[in-house]
Design a protein with these regions (language model features):
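Glycine-rich, small/polar surface segments that engage phosphate groups of diverse ligands
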Residues: 1-63
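Short, well-ordered beta-strand core segments
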Residues: 69, 95, 113-114
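A charged, well-structured terminal subsegment
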Residues: 61, 122-146
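Short, glycine/polar-rich helix-capping loops at beta-to-alpha or helix-loop-helix junctions
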Residues: 98-110
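Short glycine/serine/threonine-rich phosphate/pyrophosphate-binding segments
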Residues: 9-13, 77-84, 106
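Short beta->alpha connector loops at strand-helix junctions that form conserved
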Residues: 36, 73, 99, 114-122
């Protein structure tokens, strides 16, 4: 279980890093955060509220209308990701979900659902990384007018 969470976290961190930095092309930095990286916030929210609220509290604090919030969960049922997407909806954000074959719980919370048709955790995670790279490449092309 810990390894699965670590890889999902890695996908989020890579996506944020490539948006702030770059994937391939020189361009302006873009605002992006991986909500898993601030251990003080994660620990405080988990202790004071619950682990299921670690993303929702951050989304409430940082998200506004028109922002894009991406939830990544191989199972499609992670309570913390689901609550984070609900909070994003309340804030007026566009919600994107990356998940595996099980979409029943997450589908109603996503404006855009990208579901990998597999129940194999490793394959789902690998595709999530690929989708992050494709997204960053498309963003770079758009910014550069291609």
């Amino acid at each position: 279980m810990a390894a699965k969470r670590k890889f999902d976290r890695r996908a989020a961190v890579r996506l944020a890093a490539e948006l702030q930095g770059r994937l391939r092309r020189e361009r302006r930095a873009l605002p992006a955060l991986a909500l898993t990286t601030n251990s003080s916030v994660v620990t405080a929210v988990a202790n004071d509220y619950s682990f299921a609220d670690i993303f929702a509290r951050q989304v409430e604090a940082l998200t506004g209308r028109g922002d894009i919030v991406v939830g990544i969960t191989t199972s499609g049922a992670s309570a913390n990701v689901l609550r984070g997407l609900r909070a994003a909806r309340r804030c007026g954000a566009v919600t994107v979900a990356l998940t595996g074959a099980r979409t029943e719980k997450i589908k109603p919370l996503a404006d855009l659902l990208l579901a990998v048709p597999s129940r194999d955790t490793q394959r789902i995670q690998e595709v999530h990384i690929l989708l992050g790279h494709i997204y960053c490449e498309l963003v770079e092309r758009h910014i550069l007018g291609e």
